[in-house]
Amino acid sequence: EFVIGIDEVGRGSLAGPVAVGIAVIRRSSHDGRSDWPAKLADSKLISEKIREELYEPVQQWVTASAVGMASAQEIDEQGIIAALSLSATRAIRALPVDVRSAIAAAPESAQAILDGSHNWLGGALGPVASMVQTKADRDCVSVSAASVVAKVARDRLIVELASAHPELEPYGLAGNKGYSSAAHIAALQELGPTEHHRKTWLTKILGNDALF
């Protein structure tokens, strides 16, 4: 009855949070329809412009969607796997109450699909069965939807962060969204990391002595 697509974005970023998107599709509501938004695919395979165009239609097409995040500090303190599980838990809690209640009342009627090769959900889904599928963000529409929602939400947050903190301008976060780039690495080497950087991810760039 419920297909729950799950995907993460920002896992490999040097700065900013990691985000987990969840998209729930209720089969009885969609009644076998295949009219998902045109161009919907893995968020990493489509342009930022198209992702922005898809953001609202995707949220309207699915039964429910939500995004949870874990901060750079939480990633440093807990590790990326725990941070992903925490983000998933937060995303689930952000789903509408009626959807969460319906799934909780009949967990055997739900199936979660997680993109990747490793199940980092932990106990986030409780008794709901989950399967891990490589390239699910490309091949499963529910996971593609989760990927787009998470990517747009995280990108917007990074842009807002960069706008609110002029001191972040040398790092180019508005453009690189926290990922590695020549300008980003050069700024790290010249200015050092900020509170928004994942210090445990910078040892190869800066060395332990410069970080801790």
Label every PLM stretch briefly:
Residues 1-212:
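RNase H-like, Mg2+-dependent phosphodiesterase core
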